Regions:
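Mid-domain alpha/beta scaffold segments of enzyme catalytic cores
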Residues: 1-227
Length: 227
């Protein structure tokens, strides 16, 4: 709170841990939950649409996911199960009216294609690291674009160029805690409080004030998850 973070979304990565995430949201008014199974999660319960919809009925659950595609560790040709899992999450999102948290790693074309084929209605491209062409395709589908602490890294100049182009009303920020700690704390454990430093960098990139960027991203968060 000292860094003006007033609310945040605690993301579910498998159904076995949903109760822990949900209980945090029940106990703390500033914390909200999602429900979903991460694309790289294995040795876990496979979600079906009906089960996701049951969990999504809680008013503390504001999103479906984390879902999406990840071909970094899994060959594309071996990932049919991952694509099918993604489609089920999109169905649950569309039916529940709760937006998706979309993970995309080394799977740009398939992620955009499936979002389009399934007529995804709302969501955010979480921890975005791709190029402008991919961002534009996601924006054209109605997605929001969220930037993490990666935006502050010295190696992230191409990503900062993308961040300049995103329409202000589609920008979101995150930490992807406990990973990807932003500068100047890189190498240390991450914290939701460090969202401030992502906002700070985004304001610098877009030549605006920190207060203005915080107001914009807060408004966008409320628009996506609470409208």
């Amino acid at each position: 709170r000292g860094l003006s973070v007033s609310k945040f979304l605690c993301v579910c990565i498998d159904l076995e841990h949903f109760d822990q995430v949900h209980n945090l949201a029940l106990a703390h008014p500033s914390i909200f939950a999602s429900v979903g199974v991460h694309p790289t999660a294995t040795n876990c319960k496979e979600p079906d649409v009906e089960e996701l919809l049951v969990y999504a009925k809680s008013d503390r659950v504001i999103a479906i996911g984390e879902t999406g595609l990840d071909y970094f560790h899994i060959k594309k040709d071996d990932a049919d199960w991952q694509r099918e899992r993604f489609r089920r999450h999109i169905s649950a999102s569309n039916e529940s009216g709760k937006p998706m948290i979309v993970h995309m790693r080394d799977a740009k074309k398939d992620t955009i294609r499936i979002l389009s084929e399934e007529k995804a209605e709302a969501g955010v491209m979480h921890c975005f690291t791709a190029d402008w062409e991919t961002a534009k395709a996601a924006l054209d589908l109605g997605m929001y674009i969220s930037f993490s602490g990666i935006l502050t890294f010295n190696s992230a100049k191409p990503l900062r160029e993308v961040a300049k182009k995103i329409p202000a009303d589609r920008l979101l920020v995150e930490t992807d805690c406990p990973y990807l700690t932003p500068m100047p704390f890189r190498g240390k454990p991450n914290s939701p409080a460090y969202t401030y430093y992502v906002v700070e960098k985004l304001a610098e990139i877009r030549n605006t004030s920190i207060d203005e960027m915080a107001a914009v991203t807060t408004q966008n968060f409320n628009q996506l998850f609470f409208s």
